Curated annotation (Swiss-Prot):
Name assigned to this protein: Catalase
Basic and acidic residues bias locations: 1-22
Chief location: other
Catalytic activities: 2 H2O2 = O2 + 2 H2O
Gene responsible for this protein: cat
Amino acid sequence: MADRREKSADQMKLWKESRANQKPDVLTTGGGNPVSDKLNLLTVGPRGPLLVQDVVFTDEMAHFDRERIPERVVHAKGAGAFGYFEVTHDITRYSKAKVFEFIGKRTPIAVRFSTVAGEAGSADTVRDPRGFAVKFYTEDGNWDLTGNNTPIFFVRDAMLFPSFIHSQKRNPQTHMKDPDMVWDFWALRPESLHQVSFLFSDRGIPDGHRHMNGYGSHTFKLVNAKDEPIYCKFHFKTDQGIRNLTVEEANRLSAEDPDYGIHDLYEAIANGNYPSWTFYIQVMTFEQAERYPFNPFDLTKIWPHKDYPLIPVGKLVLNRNPANYFAEVEQIAFDPSNMPPGIEPSPDKMLQGRLFSYPDTHRHRLGANYLQLPVNCPYKARVANYQRDGPMCFSDNQGGAPNYFPNSFSAPENQPAARESKFRVSADVARYNSSDDDNVSQVRDFYTKVLSEEERKRLCENIAGHLKGAQIFIQKRAVKNFTDVHPDYGNRVQALLDKYNAEGHHKKVIKTYTQHSAHVTANDKANL
């Protein structure tokens, strides 16, 4: 009978086979000293206490105690793979970036797919946006495109990002997911309507990672060899076709195969069924941006394809699984501020906030020298700068080269060719409230023109099935927002909520303890 076991299930067997007739390695401590016995402690007699000099034990246990690093605040659960990006169409008229240098050029890439709100052990089949981050290892340094599987996002101002994420995670007292928190935030910020509608549509639960699109989401700026800038958006369209899971399928898989996304991707690559995506851009001139009826840097809106058609660029192919998950997926760090010449940020407020936040969280999670880790190292370029030392520096620390600038000793020099493009800014400095920007027009188009009748029906059912857990006043506020999009949208959700509420499915109030002073008295503690 043929062996039908999956490659992922046979990983240990395949690893052994890859070593052919090699002898097992000599077992050592972390310091490389041979170990004679890995099964038994060094004790005084068979029943005696452990000796402090049992360095084999202390070496093992001390390292075990420090195995875990901080989990990502968002996108904690993820799958990774490696491959290449190949240029199929010339866009050098728009960008001088070396990744687009000529047709046929291949650039090594690393990709990480992820859910957003769940912890590292959560299921891959939850209703949640999916991260779609790509690291291009180019000759001008790494380019990190930190996208999602949706072209829009919940908020347009980075000031709101921490509160948005808090609302999606666990209640600080009950440590449970809380529909009140989720829907209170969404209902108070109608700009979330577009992404919420996308999230609760059929595309809210992709069938693994291979059958979904990816988007840079933000607006970026491309600059050509003549230093002529143009705004752009990036798109990855899956060549496997869009495929989604039903709620019932997702619930079943969350119990039977919670790592379904990782599992599916690993097996496809291990069996030579390499997933691929076609890479496109949209472009908008500065003059068009000035005239367009909405803010082109608003992350809650798309650029309509009829106005700004997709321009094909190349192909992204994944053909290698990680050799080690921790080393190549857990430690990979994507940073939107990694942009080689030819690619620059736009005034997109969310992008501007991420330019700081992402490298900052990597320094917290992985350390100041995280870019020296092999998976993050810009190995196609030569790193030469004036950064030195720091925890876990494991390069040569740039040897005896000067560590100050300017200097007279032939150390790294400025590269005028890499100068950022010029742009004019003239406005008053203030905190501008964008909450009343048009939050419904594109959502109305999505509801009435993109979705079919059956898809609208499922959208409203999915929303009501989740919103029913929130307090009635929050439900009313959310329904008002849906009604602003289209009366039919609000009416359908309200009708379903009325049914749920009549059946007693509305939120039960959980009594919580409130600490009124800086100290808890003994009597208070006794009643906790």
